[in-house]
Amino acid sequence: MITSQMVKELRERTGAGMMDCKRALEEANGDMEKAIEILRQKGLAAAAKKAGRIATEGVVEAYIHGGGRIGVLVEINCETDFVAKTDEFKSFARDIAMQIAAAKPEYVRREDVPQEVIEKEREILRAQALNEGKPANVVEKMVEGRLEKFFKEVCLLEQPFIKNPDITVKDLLTEKIAKIGENINIRRFVRFELGEGLAKKEEDFAAEVAAAMKVNK
């Protein structure tokens, strides 16, 4: 039997609507974890449908860390001004700005990486593999595998989310689209770090941001 307390708990854990929670629990025969997975799968499907919708509202979120040592500006779009003003959306924008400060991505998504950058990285990785004495027939597979790792480091959406490394930033974005009910798009960002490119004492400001994010979960 599905109780109101079970529905309430599922709603608190997922943010889904009451009827959606009730139906998921019924489908899962009262199994809470299975109901969460059902809601997650439905949410992913719903998010995919919303992904093509035009999003021109939103915010430009600013984050400054450590007395002005790291600064980030990120533009995140949604469909309506109403959603842009919600705490849920504002909190998401803040998390993304802090992610950029901490994890130093260079692009939003892999499609944004210029082809010449990819080819240069591929050449470097190929040379490394050959220098390791790997047989020619396995070098290309190694290069492609290492190139995937490169994308996960430099592309924001493919990075592990610092507050929860079990998911990527793209997973987080998909969850927010499903929960909020509008298309959300991380359009662009810029990141500055004091003294970047200059000879200076080594200080890991990004690690400080990451630590602060984990404390403020």
UniProtKB/Swiss-Prot annotation:
Keywords: Cytoplasm, Elongation factor, Protein biosynthesis. GO terms for molecular function: translation elongation factor activity. It is found in: Cytoplasm. Coiled coil: none annotated. Residues 80-83 are annotated as: Involved in Mg(2+) ion dislocation from EF-Tu. PANTHER family: ELONGATION FACTOR TS (PTHR11741), ELONGATION FACTOR TS, MITOCHONDRIAL (PTHR11741:SF0). Associates with the EF-Tu.GDP complex and induces the exchange of GDP to GTP. It remains bound to the aminoacyl-tRNA.EF-Tu.GTP complex up to the GTP hydrolysis stage on the ribosome. NCBIfam families: tsf (TIGR00116). Belongs to the EF-Ts family. This is Elongation factor Ts.
